[in-house]
Design a protein with these regions (language model features):
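Short alpha-helical donor nucleotide-sugar binding micro-motif in glycosyltransferases
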Residues: 44-50
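Conserved acidic donor-binding segment of nucleotide-sugar-dependent glycosyltransferases
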Residues: 90-91, 95-102, 111-116
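Short acidic/histidine- and often glycine-rich active-site loop of Leloir-type glycosyltransferases
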Residues: 26, 81-91, 95-96
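Aromatic "clamp/platform" in nucleotide-sugar-dependent glycosyltransferases that forms part
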Residues: 58
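Nucleotide-activated donor-binding/catalytic signature segment of Leloir-type glycosyltransferases, i.e.
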Residues: 12, 19-41
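A short, well-ordered alpha-helix in the C-terminal region of glycosyltransferases
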Residues: 104, 111, 118-133, 139-145
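Short hydrophobic beta-strand element within catalytic cores of glycosyltransferases
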Residues: 75-78
């Protein structure tokens, strides 16, 4: 996918990598590997420093990394797999390609590279979606409501 972006003429990209990386992987662009990050403030700074979060996951129940990037106003480009479509709303909070479609993923990246207005719109709506749907207070309130409903049902049934 990165080779495809390079082939399409995008030469001024810089990759910011974090997490566990395979050794001796060569990229067509300069890269910085920040390694495995445990400090949440540093991680938020890295997400915020990026323009696009590229998440080529093939399996994901709920994409926490996409949520983290969206919370930092960095839209995701990812595959449609597992719970990802609940997190990344295609065309609203990020761009989603069919699973394994590297050509479309490259096209999505290219679109965001060329369209700064779209990039900013996705970043803003992504932040709002992360806060309004997946923040700790929202999730806690949903769980509390579920427990209360379960208790009401239990009491009714006796």
């Amino acid at each position: 996918m990165l080779e495809e972006l390079y082939r399409r003429g995008h030469r001024n990209l810089h990759l910011l990598l974090f997490g566990n990386q395979e050794k001796n992987v060569e990229f067509p662009f300069p890269s910085t590997n920040a390694g495995f990050i445990t400090d949440m403030n540093k991680l938020a700074g890295l997400y915020s420093a990026a323009d696009i979060f590229l998440n080529p996951t093939l399996q994901d129940v709920l994409s926490n990394v996409a949520l983290e990037s969206m919370a930092c106003k960095t839209p995701s480009v990812t595959f449609r797999t597992g719970g990802v479509p609940e997190v990344v709303l295609d065309g609203r909070t990020g761009l989603v390609a069919p699973q394994g479609d590297l050509d479309q993923m490259a096209g999505h990246c290219e679109r965001l590279i060329r369209d700064g207005k779209l990039l900013l719109a996705l970043a803003e709506e992504g932040r709002q979606h992360a806060e309004q749907t997946f923040s700790y207070p929202v999730i806690a309130a949903r769980h509390a409501a579920l427990y209360e409903e379960t208790l009401r049902e239990y009491r009714r049934e006796g």
